[in-house]
Structures are given as structure tokens and as C-alpha cells.
Amino acid sequence: MTTVARLRALVVLLIVVFLVGFVLVQALEPDEPGSGGTVPVAGDTTTLPGDTAATTAPGDTSATTTPGGNLPPLQEVTLELVFDGLRQPLALTAPAGDDRLFVVQRVGVIRILDENREMVDPAFLDLTDRVLAGGIEQGLLGLAFHPDYANNGRFFVYYTDKEGRRQLSEFQVTTTDPNRADPGSERVIIEREQPPEASDIRHYGGNLVFGPDGNLWVSIGDGADSRNQGQDPNTIFGTISRIDVDGDDPYGIPADNPFVDGGGAPEVWAYGLRNPWRFALDPTEGNIYIADVGHAHQEEINVVSMLEGGYNFGWSDMEGTRCFHQPDCDPADYTQPVVTYLHNDQWTEGEPHPPGLSITGGYVYRGSEIPEIQGTYFYADWVEEWIWGFKFVDGQLTEHEDWTDRLGGTVGQVNSFGIDGHGELYLLTHGGQVYKFSAVR
């Protein structure tokens, strides 16, 4: 080979080496900070985190695409028993991202189930020295962790005290043990006697939920004083109320509460409720789901925008869709429920929904383990022990159906539903069991 030919070959070899090296560097070089990888453009079919490119309904055998890859086909959704032996559990929750479960027992004790679903001893908080749990609707009723719990250790409980008063209080976790709260750290936020004409043991409400606005939402029953409470927005009884626990002592009033400038108690966000035992906020769609326990005829679920307020749900002028204390009422004057079902003695064959006597409101499923049921709201009847669900999309009720058999049959009286720190759904039974909604694939 001539000298010129050798030089030409060397030049070609150097060019090839340079090009290969450039391609490898580009392939291995990370994206710019904050870029998050490839950003889809119009017409791109890339799945973003949080999106579900394809889902299957129960019974469908096609695969489900999630950010982590393809899930095997969903065979069924079941209720998986994760713990047994609690004393009348009424609420289950956890700080965001936490692997533990915090379970409220009516007697006045909060227990922790660790990541292996073993009970942690001693209890997280024991308030049996100050909680009255005599009547079936009394006791330690609600729990919510402050949105910044990881940094400030603050949480809130709702209970009936030894005098039968409603008590909303703040506590703090100890600085030395994340599994122990300080019972001496109590700061009373709201304390109310039962209304003058109320029952001593009934209609306390008691659900606590922090909204995406950082405010604490509270359900408060009418005390079984239906003629004096439900239609009076100047009292917090029979309402969903909303307060700012980071505001003035003992609490502040959100500037956009509907009665902040008058016309009702400033804490009140909505009224006309009997005993809203459980409600749920769904920030994804911007709705609040309120399950209100009925009196003589109907149980009901109200779904409205959580961005507004001032709703009057009708009690006690109305019960569900029927006039009650006001026989000539005009339903157009009140916000109407999206779901009602009749009590046993009102029900007749052919009704589209089974009868019941006491609704237990649940949550909209927004977890990641069962994307096929995303957006489904679940609820139960405490007496009849069935479980139903529906979706509420663009103001319309869809996929309203019986889930009892699909979940494996009845599990007993459902006291409450719960959400863990990762958005997965649970239910609690009067018999002391904790069940998780789980996928079989």
C-alpha cells in the first residue's frame, strides 16, 4: 500500500472513531435537570407519569399500561384481610408517603400497624381518660394529619369528652419516638355542648380531612335536634365546616368561606345535613362527596364542587328527595343528592338500588395499584352490609353498581373506609377487621 493510501485509510478510521464516540456520549448523557426525560408533543403517544395509557374494566383480560410498565390482566378486585382484632375501628389514615397505618378505635385509642401490618406497642395515643364512648355514636371519631406533619408533627382528633361535648383538638408526636404521640400536648380547637334539644348520644359527625387548600374540613352532626339545627347556618351543627388551623388562636377562618362576611357562622362551608358521618374530598375532579345518614325514609350522597360553598342540602325540610318537616317544600330551593336509596320499610320490589338503613360514606379511589377502578367512589350500608360504587364524571353519575359479590361477599358492618399514605383504599368493620382493596392478576 502506498504512503498516500495509508494516510487516506488512517483519516477514514479517525472519522469513524469520532462519530461512534459522539453517538455514545449523546446516548449516555443524562437529560438536563428538570427535563424529566422526553416530553411528548402533539400526536406523541408517550405515557407521562400518572397517566394510564390503557386500562381494563373488571372482567376485561387485556393488559394495563402504567408508568412502571404493563400490569398483568386484572382478574378481580378483592378485599384482603390485613389485620383482625381491633376494638371498633372507626377511621384509618396516614401521613402522605408513610408506610404505616394509623387506626382510630372508638374507645379512645389510636393504634399503628407497621409496614408489615403488625400492631405497634404501646399505642400511638391513648385518650381513654378523656373520651366518652358510651353511646354507639360517641367516642374517638376522627383523625387527620397536618399536611406538613413530617416537619411539625401536628395532628388533629375529634372526640366526645366525658361530659358528652364535641371536642376538636390538636396533638403532637413526641420528638423521641415517631410511634408515640404526647397526650399532654393537647390544644383544644373547638369545644361544643350538644344542642339544647339534642340527644345526648347521637349525631356527632366527626370526620376530619385536610383539603388541598391546607384547611381542615370537619363534618358535624345535628345532635338529633332536627327542628332547630339543620336549616340554621348560624350554627355549626348539621354542617361541613372549614377552618384554618394555622391561623389565629384557636383557629382562623378561610377568606373564601361562604359566610365570612355574614349570613351564617363563619366556619360553615355547607349546611342542611343530618349526620354526615363520612365525607371525602377528591381534588382530582374538584368535588366533595358527602354521605348523610337518613332518618325515616332515605339515605343520600351529595356530590358538589369543593371550590364553591354555601350549599343547603335540605335537612330537615327535606330528607333525601322527599319533603320532610316542610310537607310543601320546593326541592328547587335545596341542593339535591346524586344518590339516594330507600329504607327497608319504604322499599318495593323493582327498585334499582337495594334498601338500607345507615349509609357509610367512602372515598374515590385514586391509588396506583388498581388503575382499572380509578375514579370509583365506594360506599356501604352499615345495616344491610352491601358495598356499592359509582363514578361521577362531568356532573353525571356513571357505572353505578353493586360491588358486594365482586369483592368476595359481605364482610360485616362497615364502620368506615380509609386511605393510606400512598392513596390505597381500605375498609374497617365493626367486628375489628381491616381490609384492603387489592387486585388479583
Region locations from a protein language model:
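Hydrophobic residues at beta-strand termini and immediately following loops
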Residues: 82, 124, 189, 269, ...
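C-terminal region of N-terminal signal peptides and the immediate post-cleavage residues
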Residues: 20-45, 55, 61, 75
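Acidic, Gly/Ser/Thr-rich repeat motifs that build Ca2+-stabilized beta-propeller blades
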Residues: 17, 22, 58-59, 66-226, ...
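Blade/loop signatures of beta-propeller domains
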Residues: 54-78, 178-183, 249-261, 324-335
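Conserved blade-ending motifs and adjacent loop-strand segments that build the rim/top face
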Residues: 273, 397-421
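Beta-propeller domain segments
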Residues: 104-107, 138-140, 148, 223-401, ...
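N-terminal Sec-pathway targeting helices
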Residues: 1-14
